Amino acid sequence: MYKSVEKVVAEYVFTVGSFPFRIKGRVTEKLGGDLAQRVYPWTVSHFYKFNKEAPGPTYPAKTDATTKEEAERLLYTYMRGFTDIAEPNAFY
């Protein structure tokens, strides 16, 4: 038996800097419950580091939204800050 289910509602592929790979972004919709309580989480395949001396990557401040459009806006806002230093997201 599963605890929850999410449906992928949008996927994006970003070309960033000179990486030999592309950064992927995904928006999902948590199913179940009533429509007024729907949650739209988003995630990315990689996180960026502000600079080489940074102790770790810069994580998104907010990854849950109340609408698909808000989740997409948060994803794009995070991607605009991307630098040339990336670390894989182990949970993507």
For each predicted feature, which ranges?
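Intrinsic disorder/low-complexity signature
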Residues: 31, 42-43, 81, 86
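Negatively charged, low-complexity tracts enriched in Asp/Glu with abundant Ser/Thr
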Residues: 1-24
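Mixed-charge, Lys/Arg-enriched low-complexity segments
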Residues: 48-92
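Short aromatic-glycine-(Arg/Gly/Cys) micro-motifs in beta-strand/loop hairpins
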Residues: 32-58
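A structural detector for beta-sheet-dominated domains
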Residues: 17, 28-30, 45, 76-77
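Short amphipathic alpha-helical "recognition" segments used for binding
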Residues: 7-11, 15, 33, 72-76
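Short amphipathic beta-strand and strand-loop transition segments with alternating hydrophobic
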Residues: 24-34
